[in-house]
Each structure stands twice: as structure tokens, then as C-alpha cells.
């Protein structure tokens, strides 16, 4: 079976985004790459590789050819399973993240709390995880 091991998120400020995900979720910086079309900082929780991308959009590069490459921010959203929702929310907000809304019913285990990072990229946190994922717990 294929396994998801990589997600890429376009951000406005690489260092600020890397600091946010490192401070809140303890993701480790595992590399940086600077290319003609832009730069990336690679983070990991030990299983998933998260690429934080920033496209320069210089004339004649692939990013400028895509038009939205230099202005697009974020994937639609991604989710991170945590041990303590309230404690994680405090860390998110202290690091500059903003609460967005709650989705689902906590009594049935399909609950997630949505936030926006400092660049506006949307992400969820969940104590119980998501169906089909390692570590998912159904109430």
C-alpha cells in the first residue's frame, strides 16, 4: 500500500513558518534548498516530510510561468494529531496562529479544531486523528 509521507505548503516567510511549526509542534528542521524558482525549508515529525515553500517568481522561471506560484499560500489544509487540544491551542496562539473554527462532534471522536498559521494556511488539530490513519482512535 502506498503511504503519504510528504506535504508541501507555500508560505510568505520561510523562517517565520519554520519557527512556528518547530515551536508549536516540535517539528525538526531537516534541510533547506535554494533554487532559481524559490526556496524550501524541510521539516519532519519523523514520519511525514513537510516542505515549506516560497516561490520567488522571477521572470523566466517555472514559478512565474505558473502565474499563481508567487502569490499562492498554502495547501487547502492539513491535520496534525496531538495529545492535548487545549495545550496545543495555547502554543498555536502564542506562536501567532489564529483559531478558525471547530468541526465535528467531540463526543463521537470525529472532532477537529481548525486554525490559520501566521501566513493564513489552514490546519487542523485532533486528539483522535482521522479515519484510516495510524493512531486513529474512535470514541
What are the roles of these predicted feature ranges?
Residues 61-65, 134-137:
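A short, polar/proline- and glycine-enriched secondary-structure boundary/capping micro-motif
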Residues 1-18, 75-80, 126-139:
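N-terminal beta-strand motif that seeds the catalytic metal site of vicinal oxygen chelate
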Residues 31-34, 76, 104:
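Short beta-strand
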Residues 3-12, 41-44, 64-139:
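Vicinal oxygen chelate
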Residues 54-58, 127-130:
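Acetyl-CoA-dependent GNAT
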Residues 2, 8-50, 54-56:
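Core segments of cupin and vicinal oxygen chelate
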